[in-house]
């Protein structure tokens, strides 16, 4: 327990909040232009070719964004919407692209969890 004298010398510090997605500037999503679309490999023990895009946001920040779902239509100069949310096995990837919005098409033939991939309801 600290003494009053110690608290007079150095007051208690309030814990500061550190954002997990600082490039969004406290916005829920942000628009950006793809500068490079490529695949990368995850950390051990996983193995795959994960689809990612380097995106220049409207606030001039460059971020790496994960493209979820099977298959995508993104290429350089595609305009995409970015949301927060990191990918645990890809270092440096702290954002997700929103499928079914702007130039990013929804996942074709998706039947379950459609809202996360921008897929329309199938005709029964």
Curated annotation (Swiss-Prot):
Record keyword ATP-binding present: no
GO process terms (BP): translation
Annotated signal peptide: none
Transmembrane segment boundaries: none
Organism: Xanthomonas oryzae pv. oryzae (strain KACC10331 / KXO85)
Domain of life: Bacteria
Example of a GO MF term: structural constituent of ribosome
Residues covered by region (Disordered): 1-24
One Gene Ontology cellular component annotation held by this UniProt entry: small ribosomal subunit
HAMAP family in the record: Ribosomal_uS12_B
Subunit organization: Part of the 30S ribosomal subunit. Contacts proteins S8 and S17. May interact with IF1 in the 30S initiation complex.
Name the record gives this protein: Small ribosomal subunit protein uS12
Pfam families cross-referenced by the UniProt entry: Ribosom_S12_S23 (PF00164)
Keywords tagged on the record: Methylation, Ribonucleoprotein, Ribosomal protein, RNA-binding, rRNA-binding, tRNA-binding
SUPFAM superfamilies the UniProt entry points to: Nucleic acid-binding proteins (SSF50249)
Modified-residue entries (3-methylthioaspartic acid), positions: 89
């Amino acid at each position: 327990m600290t003494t009053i004298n110690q608290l007079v010398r150095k007051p208690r510090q309030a814990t500061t909040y550190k954002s997990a997605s600082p490039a969004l500037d406290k916005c829920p999503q942000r628009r950006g232009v793809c500068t490079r679309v490529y695949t990368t490999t995850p950390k051990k023990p996983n193995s795959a070719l994960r689809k990612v895009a380097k995106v220049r946001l409207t606030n001039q920040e460059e971020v790496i964004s994960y493209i979820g779902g099977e298959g995508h239509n993104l290429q350089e100069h595609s305009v995409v919407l970015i949301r927060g949310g990191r990918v645990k096995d890809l270092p440096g990837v702290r954002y997700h692209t929103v499928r079914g919005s702007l130039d990013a098409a929804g996942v074709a033939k998706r039947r379950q969890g459609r809202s996360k991939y921008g897929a329309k309801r199938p005709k029964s």
